[in-house]
Structures are given as C-alpha cells and as structure tokens.
C-alpha cells in the first residue's frame, strides 16, 4: 500500500454516557429508555445523553428534560463524569491492543480516529474487518456499542460515521471520494457535515449553495471573499479531500498561551455575590498556574449579564446559537502585570480591581470567565523581573501554593478550602465535585 493510499477508522461509542449508565444497571443500552440528566436541576436542564431507544422515539440528543414527551417512561440517570472518564480510558486500552498510540487520535471522550493502514497486512484483513473486530472487542469487554466510519482520509471517515453509518443497520459506514460524490453531494442539510454549523450554512444559502455538490461547483472567488482562508477547507471537503493526516495531528503543538476558567451560574447573581465567585475563580486560576509551572503576563475577566425574556426572543428570531451569544450583554477588562506572575495575591487583587471598575452593579449576572493571558513556563528565558516586588514574600506565597496544590492532588480539590468557599453564594465546592460542569459521581 502506497504512502498516499491510507485507510482510516472513525469510531464513536453510541450514546456513550447513556450506554455506560445502562451497563452499570445491567441493562441493554440499545433497548433501554434512559437519559443522563441531573434531577436536582430544573426541568430546563440539558440531557447530556439519551439512549438509542429514546432516540428511536424521537427524543433528540442534548434536549431539555421538559421537551421529553410526558407519555414516555424512562430512567433518569444522574451524571457521573468520573465514571465516564474511567470507562473511556478502559476502551482506549482496548484500542491499544490493536494499534500503537501514534496511530490513534482521541477526538473526544467517546470518539477516536485511527490510521489502520499499516495494520491491515499485519492482521490479514480489510479496514472494515479490523473495525468490526475492534468494535466487537469493545462490546464484549465493556458492554458499550459503537459505530464505525471508514475512509481514505480523516474527513471521509468522519462523514462515513456521522451520516452513512447513522442510517446503516449495522452502524458501519464506508466512503471513498467517488461514493461520497455519488451518495452525498445532494444530501441536506449541510449542517450534517463536519465543520459546517448553522452560521456557515446560512452564509452559503445566501450564495445559493445548499448542498456539497453545489459547493463543489461554485466559483471559488466569492467563497474566498466570504470565508477567507476557511474557503479552502470548505472546497476541499466538498470534493471529499482532506490533506491533514495522522502524523500532522501528532506533530501539532498548540500556539495558545492562555489559561482560563469559566462558568454559567445556576441563578441570577447580584453584584456582591458574583464578586465572591470572581474571587474564587481568581484563586483557582492562580493555583492552576502554580500546578502547571506557568506564569501569566495578564489577567482578564468577562461577565455576561442575565438576559431578559425579550432579549432571548429577539436572539432566537435572529437565529442560531452564535446570534444568541452575541446578544448576551457583557462587560470586562484586562490588567497586565509588571512581569509574568502566578502570585495568588497579584491575580486576586487584579480581578477584584477589574470587577469593581467594569461590572455593572445593578444588573444580574449569569456567566463569568477569568482568563490568564501571555502564559509562559516559570523557567522561560527573557522574562523581565519586577524590580519592585518583594521576592521573599512571593517565594513564601509560592511555597504555600505548591503545598496546597499537593494536598488537593492527593486528597481532592475540597481537601483545602478558604473561608470564602463556605459562603452560601460560593460555587467552588460544588464545582470541585464536577467534571466539565457536571457531577463527577464521586
């Protein structure tokens, strides 16, 4: 097989969180009616996953609890994020019995890409046969069902998974460039395709483009004018082309130099209560910098205010989540430090100053983000020292932070708490019991 003749698998664990909860209860993930959602939250809470049996009844993934028809009997499982991470790691271990880690890209907790090109002769099978073998092994060891897409590049493997396998009785999909054009050039909607969201679909529609076939045949100049360099990706994907390969992914190093913490508050917070949360978040970001051996050149805060019913209705009328986020009234600011720092005192003081200077005192608050910018390694060369800083005091504070980080790493994030964490409006203790904003289950 030539270096240009590749075979990729894209494997997705079906309704992963819901499947894990079914297996934990000794139930069949494919036939059990189950949703993963926190019953302690309101009926507006989002279902993190719904089982295939619920999907068959028309219940869409990521719906809100109140949207589930009342005549459907189902199990509501409280999220257990730590368990899902553990099961995902178990399944990754199954993958490693077939492929080396350099040939696996973990796309998300429930989805991976695999370059199986060099393994087909080793195992004496086709890409589909290897995919079937891996999928059957995962099911046998963990009880979790999976779908699989196969293609000669990462994009076609992903589309084979997302579109073709979804409509296949055996949950397998396989595409090459020719079958992609033959079967999917007229497929609608465009949002079914990887990397095309509602916003891009609307912009393409204004250009008279509603299918991948129309996109492939469209003149390129207007596309580049509208989308800039991203037009190249759209055009390539319209033709089923993807130049990025597994080795490119493995060689990629992020150029991001920031560290952030954000949260959506469970209720509308007044100015004083939100300041408490901002202080907690400042403490958390400072400790994360120490844990990672990093320094920040700046710190910033963004506050999103609560939206009125009228504002939400106007955003929905404009259409799309992007329009909704654009409509959120907000404020914030940034402070640069004399030299990069991870001092808890400096970061805490800066956040309080920014909050007091920039945040409206009369408008309820619902969202907050604290971001450390210009992040560098502690030992990086060329760092300009702050000649006016008290070095001995900073060293003492740094040692305390390292000790706190060590205790939390061993005994959990709630092992060391400050007085502010015990205030009724504080969110830190609850967030410490969460993974990705949802209950960890531990």
Language-model-detected regions and their locations in the chain:
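Short acidic, glycine/serine/threonine-rich loops at helix termini
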Residues: 20-23, 46-49, 156-164, 228, ...
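Short Gly/Ser/Thr- and Asp/Glu-enriched loop/turn motifs at secondary-structure junctions
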Residues: 107-111, 151-154, 294-298, 363-367
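Acidic, metal-coordinating catalytic segment for phosphate/diphosphate chemistry
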Residues: 20, 326-442
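Catalytic palm subdomain of template-directed nucleic-acid polymerases
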Residues: 114-135, 208
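Residues that scaffold, gate, or flank divalent-cation-dependent active/transport sites
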Residues: 1-109, 113, 238
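DNA-contacting surface of Y-family translesion DNA polymerases
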Residues: 10, 202-365
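Long, highly charged, low-complexity intrinsically disordered interaction regions
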Residues: 129-188
